[in-house]
Amino acid sequence: MKSGASAASPTAKSFNFGSSRLLALAQQLRVYKPPLSSSFDEREELLAYKESTRKSITHVGFQESMAPVRFRPKKAAVLICLFEGDDGDLRVILTKRSSTLSTHSGEVSLPGGKAEEHDKDDGITATREAEEEIGLDPSLVDVVAFLEPFLSQHLLRVIPVVGILWDRKAFNPTPNPAEVEAVLDAPFEMFLKDENRRSEEFDWMGEKHLVHFFDYKTGDSDYVIWGLTARILIRAATVVYQRPPAFIEQKPNLKYSKMNQATRLYGWLKPLANLHESCENGRLLGHVPAYCLRYLVGISSR
């Protein structure tokens, strides 16, 4: 997504603008550009994938021309929908996923999902998914910024889309029971505070990462916001409030570039040469059995 945020937003005249604080925030975010150091151009990304998959796939006799498409991470987008609470604080809309879902069931997440072919940009993806999941009319959301991409554990390239809900009263949540169990909102600034927060180290793709857990209580319900959702919200709050969190987000020695991450990930496909020979049906998915891929790199079958 290289176009400006306004490309995915309705015209300003369609919104009932709220406080001067929200107006100032919208102006601030419209000029935001993700840091070059934390991402890379899609052309460079594709070249990296082509090179890394070429080295891996030639070992198992796959057609090289198919590698960039078959093994490239799919795109997704999530909506960081901000609005002004009754006390004047910024709040963000979250969902509790249905307990019947096959992945991340019952977890707190941001509205969003995978991109579809007809989606013109990441803003369309995020707002479309939000409408499908919680009944949030895209015309109510003013898309103002796109953050740098995050890679999920299921190898989705997730783009956080920041939108402003100028009139909270115009939104009547209608969760889709097949996907969402509950709709909630939380104070946005909590993701910069070292309160009701803990962290643990987890291994992922051969590296150790700090995973943050935020405990949040509203009414009679207790929620835990963690993992990728917490990472995205920490980053988004850092951008919005223009200050770092009051805790260590990631240990310096645990950081590494996304380019190295991509190269290392696809280098893991080399063991497919031996594993493929032991699989009874090597023609599933045309080339590689789906369960072999999931075993090696955790690719979701969905």
Curated annotation (Swiss-Prot):
Gene3D superfamilies (UniProt xref): Nucleoside Triphosphate Pyrophosphohydrolase
Motif range (Nudix box): 114-135
Transit peptide: 1-25
EC number(s) stated in the UniProt entry for this protein: 3.6.1.-
Binding annotation for Mg(2+): E129, E133
GO molecular function list: coenzyme A diphosphatase activity; metal ion binding
GO CC terms, sorted: chloroplast
Chain ranges of the Nudix hydrolase domain: 73-229
Cofactor(s), by name: Mg(2+); Mn(2+)
Entry's family note: Belongs to the Nudix hydrolase family.
Protein name: Nudix hydrolase 22, chloroplastic
